[in-house]
Amino acid sequence: MAPNIRKSHPLLKMVNNSLIDLPAPSNISAWWNFGSLLGICLLTQILTGLLLAMHYTADTTLAFSSVAHTCRNVQYGWLIRNLHANGASFFFICIYLHIGRGFYYGSYLYKETWNTGVILLLTLMATAFVGYVLPWGQMSFWGATVITNLFSAIPYIGQTLVEWAWGGFSVDNPTLTRFFALHFLLPFMIAGLTLIHLTFLHESGSNNSLGIVSNCDKIPFHPYFTLKDILGFMLMLLPLTTLALFSPNLLGDPENFTPANPLVTPPHIKPEWYFLFAYAILRSIPNKLGGVLALAASVLVLFLAPFLHKAKQRAMTFRPLSQLLFWILVANLFILTWVGSQPVEHPFIIIGQLASITYFTILLILFPITGALENKMLNY
């Protein structure tokens, strides 16, 4: 019998082992679709971004008008830009749901996979931040000024670091040029990290919704999960195109339709919606360095998840107390997101501070205690 080329060819063999003959648990639900959805998001963003970069000029005098030119005069330029801007929102929706799934089902116990995932999140956040500066509108400019300025809170080297990042004494042409270079580079870094993420995942195999070893009951990835993933692609690309075609500016800030002006500060400086939870935590501490540390901790706390797991069961499927805590955490994140979009005044200040305390308390204290308590209740 002739050897099957997909199993013998050096390159096709790798694709085969990752996407065709990969043994997958038979009971993984739609929550396991978000990994492939993130892959589609990345491909869409790289493709639309490449097309946009062909018409973009990274210069403070031309950036804003080059984006306007793309939308007005380039064939389907408006659509490409709308897909790219809203694609970022869908990227973050998918990654937050993907992390939430990992948290709920104890997937963080695959430490290497989880850690590379958190690094991917940080890289994605950096990419989105530098990308938001490129249109050079008011919110782009002031967002860049405020966030880069946070580095000045670092003792001793802070101010030098900020001026080095800016390429001068304020956010100006050198800043825009380097941010464009970084925004072009980072997605390819994300693609590389994704391959590492998948390599680690395929070492252990997927977790499942029962949180138990499923080696005795595996099915081939193709055709079962390829079809399931394609359905997922359709269900994500439909709302993305709907948003891009019908309400492209729904998630944007009206302030960004005004060209950047260093002499006029917008009344409310705020980032895109997907950073608001972290922004609320930053603002909740009335000290610059403290705020910066809390901001960093709000994401870096994910690295601690494997060490804070005290339950004998892996998933939360049969742990109602942890489930309750998990959904309180989700609600808390929604509150933080809402507070981050509001002005700094009463009652939003105190709500933000309480929500920030709750966020860290649940993750660092209540989850381990509840896990240990459930062990006791189940006589483990």
UniProtKB/Swiss-Prot annotation:
Domain of life (superkingdom): Eukaryota
Protein name, per record: Cytochrome b
Keyword Electron transport: yes
Anything else known: Heme 1 (or BL or b562) is low-potential and absorbs at about 562 nm, and heme 2 (or BH or b566) is high-potential and absorbs at about 566 nm.
Binding, heme b b562: H84, H183
PROSITE patterns: CYTB_CTER, CYTB_NTER
Species of origin: Ardenna tenuirostris (Short-tailed shearwater)
Membrane topology: Multi-pass membrane protein
Annotated heme b b566 binding sites: H98, H197
GO molecular function: metal ion binding; ubiquinol-cytochrome-c reductase activity
Listed cofactors: heme b
SUPFAM superfamilies documented for this protein: a domain/subunit of cytochrome bc1 complex (Ubiquinol-cytochrome c reductase), Transmembrane di-heme cytochromes
Cofactor descriptive note: Binds 2 heme b groups non-covalently.
Record's subunit section: The cytochrome bc1 complex contains 11 subunits: 3 respiratory subunits (MT-CYB, CYC1 and UQCRFS1), 2 core proteins (UQCRC1 and UQCRC2) and 6 low-molecular weight proteins (UQCRH/QCR6, UQCRB/QCR7, UQCRQ/QCR8, UQCR10/QCR9, UQCR11/QCR10 and a cleavage product of UQCRFS1). This cytochrome bc1 complex then forms a dimer.
InterPro entries documented for this protein: Cyt_b/b6_C, Cyt_b/b6_C_sf, Cyt_b/b6_N, Cytb/b6-like_sf, Cytochrome_b, Cytochrome_b_C_euk/bac, Cytochrome_b_N_euk/bac, Di-haem_cyt_TM
Keyword Coiled coil: no
Lineage, top ranks: Eukaryota, Metazoa, Chordata, Craniata, Vertebrata
